[in-house]
Amino acid sequence: MPAYKYNRVFLIVMDSVGIGEAPDAADFNDEGAHTLGHIAEHMNGLHMPNMAKLGLGLIEDIKGVEKTEHPLAYYGKMQEASNGKDTMTGHWEIMGLYIDKPFKVFPEGFPDELLQELEKRSGRKIIGNKPASGTAILDELGQEHMETGALIVYTSADSVLQIAAHEEVVPLEELYRICETARELTLDPKYMVGRIIARPFVGEPGQFKRTPNRHDYALKPFDRTVMNELKDCGLDVISIGKISDIYDGEGITSSRRTVSNMDGMDKVIDTLGEDFTGLSFANLVDFDALFGHRRDPEGYGRALEEFDARLPEVFEKMREDDLLIITADHGNDPIHHGTDHTREYVPILAYSKKHKKAQMLPLADTFADIGATIADNFQTNKPKYGKSFLSLLQ
């Protein structure tokens, strides 16, 4: 096996943790957005001593986050090059792919012609058709669904079409078949939906409960990613959280589902104790799903502090030849108008026990610099986009 600078790379994406408006924020109606900064102000200071030690406070002024004189990590920020601010666009770019046309979101619900075709093909009526929290819409429409057999269709601030059905009303196989039909219909460029999600549930009105039989029908990345290159070279690519869904399983050698940020951190810490060579790639979605979209700066702030408190466990289990990269995929400022993501810079922190004198990284004009660096480290084919910063890490 070739000698790699780092035998294992641990990449953690803090979903939606932006660090200030991007230069093109106005094009996305996001002027003034600053996810981390606004949460810190709302909390009258964030308590993130471990991220501070890495150098977070040196990237931007964040209330409560100390500016250390001796950062442990190389630190900086990255600007998104792709034309979009959703999860798939951000993650695909991290691994070397650009999206020219953003995935579509449906804040007013899906077009009638799409739903009429889905009703025709499925033989079932559709109710809902609006952005909603998955649990709230069951409380609202679950009983009607049980009485009529109509499908509950809803969306979120992301590019998703979700179909909820009671397992005793619509058998799982039928629900999955309907979702496959929806996937096929929404490949049409005029819809361009990132993901279709089957959301089965059980229980009685007032006590509905979603089951683990959720199934995602994503789009395959339009081209090869750095993960495909790693896998083809016989390296491990371990997915933690929704990474496998985001890339539709492409380039992944093993996948671990998570139920929360803390479960995600448990899984990261588990992989630190395993022998492998390659990439462990984790997404911590709670920041975005539970707090960003719901415009809950208090909950978001607490989640950031909980994440920070787990980092010493990560540091302790890291080996000399491990590299930890912490970043984000877009912003979702809970103080901002609306409930959508925000077009922001994202932070990047790159830490290894072997680094002697960490310093600031040059401003990256694409998230793909991360993928390029990982490809460079493992001596695989380079992605079309991105510039490796591997040689800067000393």
From Swiss-Prot:
The cellular component terms of Gene Ontology attached to this UniProt record, alphabetical and capped at eight, are: cytosol
Q: Which UniProt keywords apply?
A: Cytoplasm, Isomerase, Manganese, Metal-binding
Q: Which residues bind Mn(2+) 2?
A: D288, H293, H341
Give the binding site residues for Mn(2+) 1.
D15, D329, H330
Gene3D superfamilies, per the entry: Alkaline Phosphatase, subunit A, Phosphopentomutase
Name the reaction it catalyses.
2-deoxy-alpha-D-ribose 1-phosphate = 2-deoxy-D-ribose 5-phosphate; alpha-D-ribose 1-phosphate = D-ribose 5-phosphate
Where is the protein found, in the record's own terms? Cytoplasm
**What InterPro entries does the entry give?**
Alkaline_phosphatase_core_sf (IPR017850), DeoB (IPR010045), Metalloenzyme (IPR006124), Phosphopentomutase_DeoB_cap_sf (IPR024052)
Protein's UniProt keywords contain NADP: no
Which is one Pfam family of this protein? Answer: Metalloenzyme
What's the superkingdom here? Answer: Bacteria
Family, as annotated: Belongs to the phosphopentomutase family.
Name-wise, this protein is: Phosphopentomutase
**Species name for this entry?**
Bacillus subtilis (strain 168)
Q: Which lineage is the organism of this entry classified under, starting from the top rank?
A: Bacteria, Bacillati, Bacillota, Bacilli, Bacillales
Q: Which gene encodes it?
A: drm
